[in-house]
């Protein structure tokens, strides 16, 4: 017979007990003591509901069984609380991670099953920490300004506390007063005090500080320490300059976009939502989920929208294989669904194949059992950046559903220290794959052999550098000369964004990335009946105050099929492209002579062909390069890129079209549609506007007009081969059918 949770048994037994008069007079004091130790992060009533109903719902029952199996293996292996010695990925580091996971699981399973073995296991582990923690100073492998105690960086200490305090809250009323006092006075309280005492970590607007304030705030609620809660909410000085509330106000845009990008939005989401949940349960009058028009719940939706094929857009410092199945977003989906009842989130939960053993997780399980899931609608959107939404944004253009075409134009803020120097960078996805790529971060997370799992030196020398991205490089220097603090002061200006059924377009201007240089990028995702799939049109206009070298890389995924230009190759030697700012990591494989006529490059990826037609207003070289040079430790992936180079110009315009087409099936041995349906790309300059014309094999012409001044509503005209294109406003789609002279 399954045991009931202990608190359920006590609740049922109390009304039937025959107590002497003296005991009755002591009842209020006993009730007060019980209230002082009762769980507060998840209430006793909520635990009781999960214990009595959870196994009736397959998703919840499966998660509970998985957690039980995992924890029993840990319990069988015995308790191990080692003296901290290692970096990330090392034995002691990984053991302390397993320990906080075990503490959380033990507390949860005690409440769901009533089995005292889980209490004993968690208690004994925490008592060992009570012996260890007072002896610890800065970690011997300490990283950064503030080493941790249990871990090499203080961030991991915060993560430990966020998880462990939840497990402790669940067993606290099952412990003796002596054990509670030992554990709290020697583990949880000194841990929280250590975090609060380090303002360089605690009083910051950054994801590290989010974890710290969530840890101390949740600990404050459990220990009934309102002073600690107030410091967590308002900063260590309680002056509202820092703390959890200020972080909500400054780190998210009104749309729910997080400044550091999707990868770190994913990481920060867990402490934001877990602490917000604790605040809502203990101080509902704060209305934390309503703050800034519900921005925390918006952030969950935005994070899912910032993904393709289940993986997050890897902008800034990002690990490529992080996606919607991460544990942080599992928590986010559960909490957001419980607060909103948005059935679209249930389809994300189905993809995650997991849920939390929490009241929110139970609600998800109940809804899934009732078949309430609806498809999540991935749609085009402009996610404004900055606290007031006026510091650029992330433009997402989409057609043909979840695995169709997605174009991402990165017109965002710098992203603090995790930001890359890639203003107006872009990515493109199609057929379930990244096609125009972003390297992400140079890091092997928690792989000890790769420098302990930290960001590698190549993250700074390659991955952050501008040439590692698909945007303008001037004189082989990175944006803001590679200084992120300078980058924080300057953001792109979004010119316009529009998304219709057949035309989706985004445009932004960047100034001050280079002294005296301004550049504007306009990109469109265009559908046409004579094309099999939507195409990407790209227009990059550069204006400088002196002659310079302009490089425009395109990092792509696939195997080159044809190069539509003559080039010099280097079969006997492989020159390195440059000496610094990322160029030292590029091998030069082929180089064309300068020319102004549009050229092409075609490649094959996962059974689909891609033809890239490109040109420029001034003579340009086409260089084929590959990453991986000057990499003696083999830390970099070998990836191809095309680099257009214009020398000695003040102004230049780059224009291109990327066309997905055809099918290759090696198993069935057939090829369809290997030839591009676009015959020519033509760029024509007018007095105050440009027209890019795509001339199709069918005879039809796709034309896009773009005005220099996006604010104007006046008429613009550009003549192309005797045909006058006219439109009003910032831009217009101006197609012509075969034989159309109008």
UniProtKB/Swiss-Prot annotation:
Optimum pH is 8.5. Transmembrane segments: none annotated. Changing residue 455 to F: Displays less than 1% alginate and poly-ManA activity compared to wild-type, yet approximately 8 and 4% wild-type activity toward poly-GulA and poly-MG. InterPro entries: Alg_lyase (IPR054935), Alginate_lyase_dom (IPR008397), Chondroitin_lyas (IPR008929), Hepar_II_III_C (IPR012480). The zinc ion likely plays a structural role. Its EC number is 4.2.2.26. GO terms for cellular component: periplasmic space. The keyword Lipoprotein does not apply. Substrate binds at residues 143, 153-156, 204, 208, 263-266, 443, 669. Changing residue 153 to A/N: 2- to 3-fold decrease in activity against alginate and its three block structures. One of its GO terms (molecular function) is metal ion binding. Gene3D superfamilies: 2.70.98.70, Chondroitin AC/alginate lyase. It catalyses: Cleavage of 4-deoxy-alpha-L-erythro-hex-4-enopyranuronoside oligosaccharides into 4-deoxy-alpha-L-erythro-hex-4-enopyranuronate monosaccharides. The keyword Ribosomal protein does not apply. Is an attractive candidate for the broad-spectrum digestion of polyuronides into fermentable monomers for biofuel production. The record marks 207-208 as: Neutralizes the sugar carboxylate group at subsite +1. Disulfide bonds: none annotated. This is Alginate lyase.
